[in-house]
């Protein structure tokens, strides 16, 4: 039986080019397609982020308010978009737009703005803004509070240009690997431990030096993974939320109760542990039989 089309699928460069320039009229069909994908039951405020990467592909992000959990654990539309870009090995973000209705395009919230600043050449990202009187393209830094902008100016330049880096490898290894599960090529295997370690090695944690990765398995044995992403101004998207984005964009949708197993990899002596947050989120949204195992790395 043919699989239904993936509603989160990116537009190819050809599709993006044929749809027209990155403007409100051409983005409206994408916004309308994505709005039902947002999970915003408590707030009743769905939001869509649309981004065009350096490859020419166009990606979607939506806000996800996780049922039964504090809004602090919600996935913002901009955070979703950044993970979607990273999962698809995009290197930069050329164009960006946020909308809750397809008619007006708004600036990103402070959390998303801070995270987006970590992307290579973020100052060159075209941010589409509309208001009742005019349309304009703005710089992301325009919406970054001055106190945070000064923080970015103090950060060594080599920290930047790495958030979207498919070649990043933090050089982590498991402290006590299971010899039964030793892999000839851990880069392509689907063991949860290997996938979680691989995710931790892609983690973007230049400030806390506390990388983490999560791998999740559903009832069908399919594996999804994600890694933590930091910004200089403190907001962090945890590895568990990033793995849920992988789950949503690769066939799982919002059926989080199909998730039955998970592994988290982090440093044993990490200054910032992601375990408590990951456990709280996954124990709430995954299947009641869900088990999360923790492996330490160095």
Swiss-Prot record:
<feature type="binding site">
    <location>
        <position position="76"/>
    </location>
    <ligand>
        <name>Zn(2+)</name>
    </ligand>
</feature>
<dbReference type="InterPro" id="IPR006263">
    <property type="entry name" value="Cyt_deam_dimer"/>
</dbReference>
<feature type="domain" description="CMP/dCMP-type deaminase 2">
    <location>
        <begin position="187"/>
        <end position="298"/>
    </location>
</feature>
<dbReference type="GO" id="GO:0004126">
    <property type="term" value="F:cytidine deaminase activity"/>
</dbReference>
<dbReference type="GO" id="GO:0009972">
    <property type="term" value="P:cytidine deamination"/>
</dbReference>
<keyword id="KW-0479">Metal-binding</keyword>
<feature type="binding site">
    <location>
        <position position="112"/>
    </location>
    <ligand>
        <name>Zn(2+)</name>
    </ligand>
</feature>
<dbReference type="InterPro" id="IPR050202">
    <property type="entry name" value="Cyt/Deoxycyt_deaminase"/>
</dbReference>
<dbReference type="InterPro" id="IPR016193">
    <property type="entry name" value="Cytidine_deaminase-like"/>
</dbReference>
<dbReference type="InterPro" id="IPR013171">
    <property type="entry name" value="Cyd/dCyd_deaminase_Zn-bd"/>
</dbReference>
<feature type="domain" description="CMP/dCMP-type deaminase 1">
    <location>
        <begin position="22"/>
        <end position="151"/>
    </location>
</feature>
<dbReference type="GO" id="GO:0008270">
    <property type="term" value="F:zinc ion binding"/>
</dbReference>
<feature type="binding site">
    <location>
        <position position="109"/>
    </location>
    <ligand>
        <name>Zn(2+)</name>
    </ligand>
</feature>
<feature type="binding site">
    <location>
        <begin position="63"/>
        <end position="65"/>
    </location>
    <ligand>
        <name>substrate</name>
    </ligand>
</feature>
<comment type="similarity">
    <text>Belongs to the cytidine and deoxycytidylate deaminase family.</text>
</comment>
<dbReference type="InterPro" id="IPR002125">
    <property type="entry name" value="CMP_dCMP_dom"/>
</dbReference>
<protein>
    <recommendedName>
        <fullName>Probable inactive cytidine deaminase 9</fullName>
    </recommendedName>
</protein>
<feature type="region of interest" description="Disordered">
    <location>
        <begin position="1"/>
        <end position="23"/>
    </location>
</feature>
<comment type="subunit">
    <text>Homodimer.</text>
</comment>
<dbReference type="Pfam" id="PF08211">
    <property type="entry name" value="dCMP_cyt_deam_2"/>
</dbReference>
<keyword id="KW-0862">Zinc</keyword>
